[in-house]
């Protein structure tokens, strides 16, 4: 059984990071473009990690199987009807972004960051809402 406090804490991190991204990108603050990019990437990374933590918590506590890697946790959520398969696939890609950002595998493409901010923050919210609804949190 999922732990309510863990789920709520991870959802709060996701919400806070999304709010911070929208705030820093939505109004002039006297920040340089590199500062805005750094704040955005940091908060995307934190939100992605919170989503990973949320998924792995559910997979573990609900005994959905043993994922081969953290990205597979989203697939398992899809297979068990917590989220749909399309959302699971998009969240798996978010893991790839997080890995690049955290491990500096390569330079982060600002166009990818913009795409995530403009088109994929809703995926993180959808995961949070689906988990909360499924488990009555």
Regions found by a protein language model. Give the residues of each.
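Solvent-exposed interaction patches of small proteins and small membrane subunits
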Residues: 1-137
């Amino acid at each position: 059984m999922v732990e309510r406090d863990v789920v709520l804490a991870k959802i709060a991190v996701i919400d806070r990071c999304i709010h911070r991204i929208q705030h820093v990108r939505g109004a002039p603050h006297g920040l340089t473009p590199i500062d805005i990019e750094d704040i955005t990437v940091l908060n995307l990374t934190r939100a992605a990690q919170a989503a990973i933590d949320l998924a792995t918590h559910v997979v573990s506590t609900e005994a959905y199987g043993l994922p081969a890697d953290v990205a597979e946790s989203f697939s398992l959520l899809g297979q068990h009807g917590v989220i749909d398969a399309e959302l699971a696939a998009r969240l798996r890609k978010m893991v790839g972004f997080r890995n690049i950002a955290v491990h500096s595998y390569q330079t982060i493409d600002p166009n990818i960051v913009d795409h995530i901010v403009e088109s994929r923050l809703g995926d993180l919210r959808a995961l949070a809402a689906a988990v909360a609804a499924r488990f009555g949190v």
